[in-house]
Regions:
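Acidic/His-rich structured neighborhood in mature extracellular/periplasmic domains
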Residues: 1-53, 59-67, 71-72, 80, ...
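Short amphipathic beta-strand and strand-loop transition segments with alternating hydrophobic
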Residues: 72-73, 133
């Protein structure tokens, strides 16, 4: 069960229905998804002025917003290439994003990011690295 205060949301079983049945699980997921979206994630994580690292997120906050996670990085001749993954809805399978890198086809789905001023287009969303990059 969720308990809301002005600053945070906490979970507990107090006054909640106990059990591991599907209906209870779906109610729990519904509550989590109501509060754990791209807008709250964007606010809770730290911004950075450095180039991305594995595990960092690109977040467009909103309702709906969108999030991609950096799952790998290659550096070749001083250029950083990144591999991204995302999911279209909470609790769906994660997919590796097809990169568009016509200059270096041998890097497959990896996308270059040269500076924090770069903007990259992923799955219909334009991410500004300086604005949208968040780190743990």
């Amino acid at each position: 069960r969720l308990h809301k205060s002005s600053k945070c949301i906490t979970f507990s079983q107090k006054n909640g229905r106990k059990g591991y049945d599907r209906a209870n699980f779906e109610k729990y997921l519904f509550e989590v998804m109501m509060y754990a979206g791209s807008a709250s994630l964007y606010q809770e994580l730290n911004s950075t002025n450095k180039l991305p690292k594995i595990g960092d997120l690109l977040i467009i906050p909103g309702y709906p917003g969108h999030v991609v996670i950096i799952i790998d990085k290659k550096t070749v001749k001083g250029i950083n290439y990144y591999l991204f993954a995302n999911s279209w809805m909470p609790a769906q399978d994660i997919e590796i994003i097809s990169g568009k890198n016509p200059k270096c086809r041998n890097f497959g789905n990896y996308t270059p990011i040269l500076s924090t001023n770069d903007k990259i287009y992923i799955n219909g969303y334009l991410f500004n690295i300086k604005t949208h990059l968040r780190t743990w």
